[in-house]
Swiss-Prot record:
Disulfide linkage: 25-49, 32-53, 36-48, 42-57, 69-94, 77-98, 81-93, 87-102
Subcellular location: Secreted
Gene Ontology terms, MF aspect: serine-type endopeptidase inhibitor activity
PROSITE patterns, per database record: WAP
Residues annotated as domain WAP: 17-61, 62-106
InterPro entries: Elafin-like_sf (IPR036645), WAP_dom (IPR008197), WAP_four-disulfide_core (IPR050514)
Record bears the keyword Cytoplasm: no
Keyword annotations from UniProtKB, A to Z: Disulfide bond, Glycoprotein, Protease inhibitor, Repeat, Secreted, Serine protease inhibitor, Signal
Name used for this protein in its record: WAP four-disulfide core domain protein 3
Pfam family, one: WAP
Length: 130
């Protein structure tokens, strides 16, 4: 029975090896590291947060595009981009714990002044003014 089990394992290992590519996998661009020791060790406006396997400063990526990164992808260690330029137009490369994702940037409320809701509200205020 053990020999049959070992033979089955060996056959599956050989079959899996047939699909493997040559070469080595690249190093993880964001390995688990202690990149900060507290909020005071981070740039202004950033916090020292757990990545699940270390700590890193979290906040906007300096020098990036307009808009803020939403905080919905925490805990996923997938690196889809390294900087905003790796993303499509209108998207930001946002940190998420130990990963980075391309997602549309959130605009601050002041920048939403062209929306229909704001225009309608301003029209009502102007009509009520003496």
């Amino acid at each position: 029975m053990k020999a049959l089990l070992a033979l089955g394992f060996l056959a599956s290992w050989v079959a899996a090896g047939e699909h493997a590519l040559r070469g080595e996998c690249p190093a993880d661009p964001l390995p688990c590291q202690e990149l900060c020791t507290g909020d005071e060790s981070c740039p202004q406006g950033h916090k020292c947060c757990s990545t699940g396997c270390g700590h890193a400063c979290r906040g906007d990526i300096e020098g990036g595009r307009d808009g803020q990164c939403p905080r919905i992808l925490v805990g996923l260690c997938i690196v889809q981009c390294m900087m905003d330029e790796n993303c499509q137009s209108g998207e930001r490369c946002c940190k998420s714990g130990c990963g980075r994702f391309c997602i549309p940037g959130l605009q601050p409320l002041q920048q939403l002044k062209d929306s229909n809701l704001t225009d309608g509200f301003n029209s009502k205020l102007e009509a009520q003014a003496p």
